[in-house]
């Protein structure tokens, strides 16, 4: 059966809807960036770090350490702006592969946290996902990455 008949609309209209949706998301992101332009980078760092710690603590409540080993980090692209300059001055993170600024799970978690030195990829992914989500709420373009060991 033809796609247009099945769903009752043309592919052209559907692609226009997708373009409009993408444009609205881009505009929304620009508004968030504008609103958060004057936010102190220290506040952004601590808010995101607290979100990561809370996510890891909730995930590990009444559990044992998952044994699947790996690495996780958050990549901010492009590697410029107030927040990235703050990270560079503080010695947090380094240059990411294929561009951007990479913040490791070990940089995110406090030194005294019981799950900071874990090898579990699941725990690291949970923390980095929460950290990236918090940064995105401030209008930063970032992704959470992981790889198995």
Residue ranges and their predicted role:
Residues 12-13:
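Polybasic, lysine-rich low-complexity intrinsically disordered segments
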Residues 23-93:
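N-terminal leader/targeting segments
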Residues 16-18:
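Generic short N-terminal amphipathic or hydrophobic helices
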Residues 96-112:
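Acidic, low-complexity, intrinsically disordered interaction modules
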Residues 111-149:
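Short, compact, well-ordered microdomains
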């Amino acid at each position: 059966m033809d796609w247009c008949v099945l769903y009752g609309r043309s592919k052209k209209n559907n692609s226009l809807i997708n373009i409009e949706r993408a444009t609205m998301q881009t505009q929304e992101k620009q508004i968030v960036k504008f609103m958060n332009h004057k936010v102190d980078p220290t506040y952004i760092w601590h808010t995101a770090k607290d979100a990561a710690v809370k996510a890891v603590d909730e995930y590990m409540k009444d559990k044992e350490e998952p044994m699947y080993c790996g690495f996780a980090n958050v990549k901010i692209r492009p590697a410029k702006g107030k927040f990235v300059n703050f990270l560079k001055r503080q010695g947090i993170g380094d240059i990411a592969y294929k561009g951007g600024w990479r913040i490791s799970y070990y940089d995110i978690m406090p030194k005294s946290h019981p799950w900071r030195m874990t090898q579990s990829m699941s725990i690291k992914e949970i923390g980095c996902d929460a950290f990236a989500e918090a940064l995105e709420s401030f209008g930063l373009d970032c992704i959470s990455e992981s790889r198995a060991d």
